[in-house]
């Protein structure tokens, strides 16, 4: 049986794959607050602010760790998405998928799910998703996405 996934609790900057291995996919919920008021809890501040993992460092290490056909998938605030798109381009990545997520149909998107590849020339798959219907219930998309996390 081959290994299909691995979770490592370590700073990306210090991570060295075993046997010079590279990965087909990297998924990250990177810190995304820039120059904003920090939480007094050091762990929360590290998880939320880019001081510990600047955007350029994320892309540089993703490039180092991905196969030539691998993808980097991240979730970021929609209002910061352009910053990530620009940085991705500077590191040789191109956007292959984008899903902008709204909490309700009437609100603007709050989060963007972005997938980048090192290969170029493909069409960008775009989608918009909504978490809650107007009545407050989970949308079918969100219910299907999170079904495995709920007790039945």
Task: Tell what function each PLM region has.
Residues 1-14:
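Conserved SAM-binding strand-loop segment of SAM-dependent methyltransferases
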Residues 3, 21, 93:
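Structured loop/turn residues at beta-strand edges in well-structured enzyme cores
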Residues 14-21:
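Short amphipathic alpha-helix with an adjacent loop that forms part of the alpha/beta core around
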Residues 21, 30-57, 61:
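Mobile active-site "lid"/loop adjacent to the S-adenosyl-L-methionine
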Residues 24:
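Conserved acidic residues
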Residues 27:
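A conserved beta-strand element that flanks and buttresses the S-adenosyl-L-methionine
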Residues 52-109, 113-114:
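Conserved Class I SAM-dependent methyltransferase catalytic core
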Residues 106-152:
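SAM/dcSAM-binding transferase cores
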């Amino acid at each position: 049986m081959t290994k299909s996934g691995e979770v490592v609790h370590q700073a990306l900057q210090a991570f060295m794959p075993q046997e010079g291995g590279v990965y087909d996919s990297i998924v990250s919920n990177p810190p995304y607050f820039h120059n904003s008021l920090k939480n007094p809890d050091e762990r929360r501040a590290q998880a939320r602010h880019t001081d510990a993992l600047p955007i350029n460092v994320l892309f540089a290490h993703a490039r180092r760790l991905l196969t030539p056909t691998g993808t980097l998938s991240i979730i970021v605030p929609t209002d910061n998405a352009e910053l990530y798109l620009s940085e991705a381009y500077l590191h040789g990545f191109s956007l292959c998928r984008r899903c902008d997520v709204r909490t309700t149909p009437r609100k603007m998107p709050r989060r963007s799910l972005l997938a980048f590849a090192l290969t170029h020339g493909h069409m960008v798959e775009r989608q918009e998703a909504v978490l809650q219907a107007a009545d407050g219930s989970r949308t079918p998309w969100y219910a299907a996405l999170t079904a495995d996390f709920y007790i039945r």
